[in-house]
Amino acid sequence: MSECPHHHPFADDPRIGYDALHAEPLTRDAHDRWVVARHRDAVAVVTDPETFSSHVSRFLQVPNGLDGAAHGEARELLDPFFSADRMAALAPLLEEVTRGLLAGVTPGQSLDAVLDLGSVYAVRAQSAWLGWPAELEPELLAWMDDNHAATRSGELSRTAVVAHRFDAIIHRLLSFRRIRKPGPPADLTDELIRVKHHDGRPLGEDEIVSVLRNWTGGDLGSLALCTGVALYWFATHPELQDELRAASDDDFDRAVDEILRIDDPFVSNRRVATVQTDLGGRQIGPGEQLVVNWTAANRDPDVFPDPDRYDPVGHAAANLVYGTGPHVCPGRPLATLELRVLLRGVLREHRVRLAPGTTPEREQPPVGGFRRVPVILDPL
């Protein structure tokens, strides 16, 4: 989950404030944590897990809160769920979800790219991937809204309550599955329940809940935010819509990655120093926390001289939207596929424009992207 100071003077566009962070190598936030904004420092932190540990959260986080051998084993066990073959098998289901969602669009009527499209698609796409029942949709949509509100507040008590609510949903799903008659796994969640550690131990209930929380709890909101950012970009850059309709999948994915670099909704991750070390000319003591601000790093003028310039090919190698190093996002293949299917589906049949008389509303730190983007999808 993204974390950084929750009071921000640049309400109209928090990226202005993030861009200002580049003036100093490191800064302190309201919680006395080091904020890492420069691209080279962000890369240095996340590629050195021995010096900068990912074991920060008070909650068990598998695999993103693990280090060393435990993290390596978790990735070996879980990364196959995102294999190319699995993504190819999932694609037709996502196409079906997209068709069903877009069939409900009324021509000429304003809808919110984040809530009406992004959030609903995120829940339906993740449910299709995991084999979760459609009846969960209202509960998951309500949870997403409450989770963003709690994160926005910066109050640990509120975020803890929301986290426990999501864990309760997962426990309920798991209990239903465990009372079923034995047989081959019916879906991906069934497969996950049967995963075993390298020494033969089955994953514990707390580990399974953590994995599913990581896969869904964060990704539901992130996918909705990405949808809002992408459709806002399409609406404000109409010439790109025609270009992307004719693009190959690889070119389309690079374009979306670049849009997300320019306006990265994955704001930050934390690390904690394990030893005394120097970073950007600052002395970091053991036990001190760092907030790696991905949004700022992806707009570092030392790497991207004009951060708002759209260059999918030229900027690809330095793009940090999905992180880098041993903790590079394992779910990138899934997120890329989900976004491609939805956004291609939108562009295949529609031209996107901002709804007249409305103003998109930015999310506020520590959440990125937009809270609402009113758009109209005009039939081609």
Model-predicted segments: where are they?
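Cytochrome P450
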Residues: 1-380
